[in-house]
Amino acid sequence: MAKLTKRMRNIREKVEVTKEYDINEAVALLKELATAKFTESVDVAVNLGIDARKSDQNVRGATVLPHGTGRDIRVAVFTQGANAEAAKEAGADLVGMEDLAELVKKGEMNFDVVVASPDAMRVVGQLGTILGPRGLMPNPKVGTVTPNVAEAVKNAKAGQVRYRNDKNGIIHTTIGKVDFDAAQLKENLEALLVALKKAKPTSAKGTFVKKVSISTTMGAGVSLDQATLNTQTN
């Protein structure tokens, strides 16, 4: 039988697996248990009441978190003309068309998000086998194929998170870093949950957000009491 590490023993002692924690209590617990030698991310898993086998019940989109994710995001933009200048002014790290495509083909992909204007998709479309498996292919559903590339760049830089349910109907994404204060993490999580509720498929029946749990990069998941979150949609 594998020997438990000191870290895992500590987690087992502190985390009650059947308990739904108040958000502030949960964040305090994650901070206490985050002992890695780097600043861990705070990740969230949201179990949705959908049938992921049905295409009309899949949930996909993007939202800007009010306090960002704590990451420096590098953005590559496929566009030309006036849009290229607008993208650069908005803070894009790489801007181009065929020249940028050549870098991608060579494996030089020093970026986290790819944005494209509609007229550039003839170039980007040829890169699907490279960008697709890495989750980098631009898509209008998450706002990365758009005529307004400058806004897309600003959103990405401001801490936009993209979300998509997996085959089990669960959304996995990040809501910040463990060194964020509790209020920032709470507001980021609430913003994400509001966005998810607005994206609820019309064909999904019953309780939509079934379970919410948060964890750090190296830590265990902590289930949340949703009553301690303000996720009312207008």
UniProtKB/Swiss-Prot annotation:
GO molecular function, a single term: structural constituent of ribosome
GO annotations of cellular component type: cytosolic large ribosomal subunit
Keyword line: Repressor, Ribonucleoprotein, Ribosomal protein, RNA-binding, rRNA-binding, Translation regulation, tRNA-binding
SUPFAM superfamilies, A to Z: Ribosomal protein L1
Chain coiled-coil ranges: none
Primary role: Binds directly to 23S rRNA. The L1 stalk is quite mobile in the ribosome, and is involved in E site tRNA release. Protein L1 is also a translational repressor protein, it controls the translation of the L11 operon by binding to its mRNA.
Family: Belongs to the universal ribosomal protein uL1 family.
Subunit structure: Part of the 50S ribosomal subunit.
Name of the molecule in the record: Large ribosomal subunit protein uL1
The species this protein was found in: Aliivibrio fischeri (strain MJ11)
Organism classification: Bacteria, Pseudomonadati, Pseudomonadota, Gammaproteobacteria, Vibrionales
